């Protein structure tokens, strides 16, 4: 999960949402245990003024940003947890992949995440339930009786809670392949 700044009005020309926080957990597909994590703030380079407003909303302080890492270092941390073709990159919604891809493009760095490894758990949950709307992460964890923690809308806590929901769904017998098969059928 990433925290980024998005604002509809008053954006500079060419504006894109910069990642200002990353949170990730790595879950072993067999044991369903957490085997790694990332929790860092990320320096905004292109739109620091706009990022400041996003930091205020997400309760990120200037002191937090003193320990922030560079975008390229964040990608290296992702590479340490993610093995292309062998690891799913799971997030709640499709925006996380898009914001990483755009950040890579703007920084002129290679995106370490393959699009075919990206799993939008919100879309998968929607299909699993047969809903016509997308459920929010908080409501989905409540529906599945997942014991959540931390603050909502902070990158690491959202990643940890998404991971807990994924583990619950997998433990209940859900398979990610079922999502891709069903999604492919819908797009025929």
What are these regions (language model features)?
Residues 1-4, 123, 161:
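Short, glycine/acidic-enriched loop or turn micro-motifs at the edges of active sites
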Residues 1-97, 112, 142-143:
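Conserved non-catalytic scaffold segment of RNase H-like nuclease domains
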Residues 42-43, 48-58, 62-65, 122-159:
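Active-site-proximal helix-loop-helix substrate-binding element of RNase H-like nuclease domains
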Residues 94, 114-121, 151-159, 179-182:
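Short, surface-exposed recognition loops or helix-turn segments adjacent to catalytic cores
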Residues 95-117:
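Substrate-recognition/cap helix-loop segment adjacent to the acidic, metal-dependent catalytic center
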Residues 98, 160-163:
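A structural signal for well-ordered alpha-helical segments within the folded catalytic domains
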Residues 103-107, 127, 143, 165-172:
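Active-site catalytic microenvironments for nucleophilic, acid-base chemistry
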Residues 165-188:
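Acidic two-metal-ion nuclease catalytic site recognized across multiple nuclease folds
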């Amino acid at each position: 999960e990433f925290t980024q700044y998005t604002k509809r009005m008053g954006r500079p020309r060419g504006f894109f949402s910069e990642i200002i926080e990353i949170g990730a957990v790595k879950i072993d597909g067999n044991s369903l245990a957490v085997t790694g994590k990332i929790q860092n703030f990320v320096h905004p380079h292109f739109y620091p003024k706009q990022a400041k407003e996003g930091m205020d909303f997400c309760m990120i302080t200037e002191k937090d940003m003193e320990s922030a890492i560079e975008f390229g270092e964040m990608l290296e941390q992702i590479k340490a947890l993610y093995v292309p073709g062998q690891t799913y990159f799971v997030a709640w919604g499709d925006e996380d992949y898009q914001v990483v891809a755009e950040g890579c493009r703007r920084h002129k760095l290679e995106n370490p995440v393959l699009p075919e490894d990206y799993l939008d758990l919100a879309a998968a949950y929607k299909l699993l339930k047969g809903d016509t709307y997308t459920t929010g992460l908080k409501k989905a964890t409540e529906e599945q009786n997942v014991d959540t923690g931390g603050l909502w809308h902070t990158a690491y806590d959202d990643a940890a809670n998404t991971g807990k929901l994924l583990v619950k769904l997998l433990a209940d017998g859900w398979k990610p392949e079922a999502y891709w098969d069903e999604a492919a059928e819908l797009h025929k």
